[in-house]
Amino acid sequence: MRRFLLFALTAGISIPIVACSPKQQASREPVVVETLISATESWNGDSFKYPRGQAEMKLEKITAQPGFKTPLHLHPQPGIIYVQRGTLYCETSDGKSLTVAAGESFASSQDTVHYCENNGDEDMVVFVASAGAKGKKTTVTTE
């Protein structure tokens, strides 16, 4: 009986100490998945369609100095753009425009003529993910 009481007393003191351990209070999930964007059409309303041929996924990092402006161009495949640093400004040939700040993402236009520029005062860094076809250009200039 003494052994049982000693065990019960020891367990009764130990359990609250373990339960209040700093490691227990600071625990968190080992991984967190956060969807930054999920889209069925582009920012300007273009419907997505995949090009014919062998699928090719591409991720490009683009660094542009202040004042850089692309020529008029289009993208023949769906894509997603994430602005890591700076501000990206895009405008379509029909006058629709979009300004995207650092930390934001958007679904790029498809088959719509547009230009983009860094109109900020620091280098702009963007990541472009494209779902195209092997051997096909992801950007087609129209000028």
Regions found by a protein language model. Name each.
Residues R2-T10:
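Sec-dependent signal peptide recognition
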Residues F4-L5, I17-K58, A107, T141-E143:
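A short, N-terminal "cap"/entry segment at the start of jelly-roll beta-barrel domains
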Residues T10-V18:
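Hydrophobic h-region of N-terminal signal peptides that target proteins for export
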Residues P51-A55, G67-I80:
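A short beta-loop-beta micro-motif enriched in histidine and acidic residues
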Residues A64, D94-D111:
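Short acidic-glycine-tyrosine-enriched beta hairpin
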Residues K69-P71, Y89, F106, Q110-C116:
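Histidine-centered metal-chelating micro-motifs
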Residues H75-D94:
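Glycine- and acidic-residue-biased ligand/ion/polar-headgroup-sensing regions
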Residues D111-K136:
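Ligand-binding loop in jelly-roll beta-barrel domains
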